[in-house]
Amino acid sequence: MIRQYLILFMFFLLLGGCAHQIDTKTTLYDDWKPRLAAQKTWQVEGKLAFISPEERQSANLNWQQTTNSNNLILTTFIGTRILSLKQTVNGAELEFDGDEYFDTNAAELLKRLTGFTLPVDNADNWLKGTIDDQSLVVDELGRAKQVLWFDNTGKKWQIDYGTYVQNAGYWLPTKLTLKHQQIKIKIQLYDWQFK
């Protein structure tokens, strides 16, 4: 008799546990896009692939932004640092091959020393998918799908947003592709954090 009650108790306990599963997704803000655009302190990790007719390169990335600085660190897949690029109001600093270099523009400094073209100066808008432009195409949920955009140096970029994840009340891009002439940059993002 006690055994039957114990089995019945365990059955109801199991049933109750299934009925109260916790949803791991956060609630989406109704005004998620303007809130995300206003969010100026963030960090994201991911992978980056640079593809041109001459070469193909890939790296892990750690991108951090605060109200005063933008810091991009690229590492190999085993964790060896390739470069560190920091932009502040005072200028840009690039650590590459054990040396430090300085300039006023982070994207130009990166291009000059590595040959790598990436519009790092406006990353806050295009990386989060909050870019606002007349050419912007959005999906049925209001998320950026594609945009033609000019960076600070006048280069025209086509940015295609592949997939999103719902996190911290926002829709955040997880896969995007940037194209400029014959250059293609594929970025996969994960582990978005906001402070």
Region spans (language model):
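N-terminal helix-cap/turn-to-beta initiation motif at the start of protein domains
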Residues: 31-41, 115
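Positively charged n-region of N-terminal signal peptides that target proteins for export
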Residues: 1-4
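Post-signal-peptide N-terminal segment of Sec-exported extracytoplasmic proteins
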Residues: 37-71, 75-76
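Flexible, processing/modification-adjacent segments and terminal tails
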Residues: 96-155
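Bacterial Sec signal peptide processing site at the extreme N-terminus
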Residues: 12-35
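An acidic-aromatic
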Residues: 69-117
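Gly/Pro-enriched, hydrophobic low-complexity segments
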Residues: 129-195
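Beta-strand-dominated lipid-handling architectures at cellular/organellar boundaries
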Residues: 45, 64, 84-86, 91-93, ...
